[in-house]
């Protein structure tokens, strides 16, 4: 059961990361159409104007392959490439950060609980009510239908039970009494 919940939570989280990257990609495409807006996301290089964009050139030179601004890491890549769908943008998130997200529909609410806390949940239908009882406490439960009434009696007390239909009336007689009555 726990494995199923954890698997579902991980799948939902990966789907959320994928949706986030798609939304960021569409935002960046819209920003690429608006050269006046330059938003820098953490972990990304600032967007560079395209080589065909000659508006705002102060130096009078052709854009060509000459980089504007500081050289970027990687050497060969002088312009940031748009991210591919499905790739995660920005710094990779640590495990602790992912647990602080609000719960997804269908997942359990809040952070995953530990084993000891799960025993304090309200009982599910069909389960016994309350926390599991110990062996000694089970004798004090109310009798189930079809069981004998009251707590189980010990061996010496069984002779005092009321007779069951088909048995002889009264307590079972001792062997010596049977001989005296048969004579």
Swiss-Prot record:
Chief location of this protein within or outside the cell: secreted
Keywords attached to this entry: Repeat, Secreted, Signal
Keyword field contains Repeat: yes
Location in the cell: Secreted
Q: What span is annotated as the signal peptide, if there is one?
A: 1-14
Location of region: Disordered: 22-183
Q: Which ranges does the UniProt record give for the sequence repeats? A: 81-100, 101-120, 121-140, 141-160, 161-180
The UniProt entry, under Pfam families, shows: Pro-rich
| Stretches with biased composition (Acidic residues) | 52-65
What InterPro entries does this protein map onto? Pro-rich
| GO CC term, one of those recorded | extracellular space
Compositional bias (Low complexity) = 86-183
Please name the PANTHER family in this protein's record. Answer: BASIC SALIVARY PROLINE-RICH PROTEIN 1-RELATED, PROLINE-RICH PROTEIN
- The protein in question is named Acidic proline-rich protein HP43A
Taxonomic lineage is: Eukaryota, Metazoa, Chordata, Craniata, Vertebrata
Gene for this protein?
Answer: H29
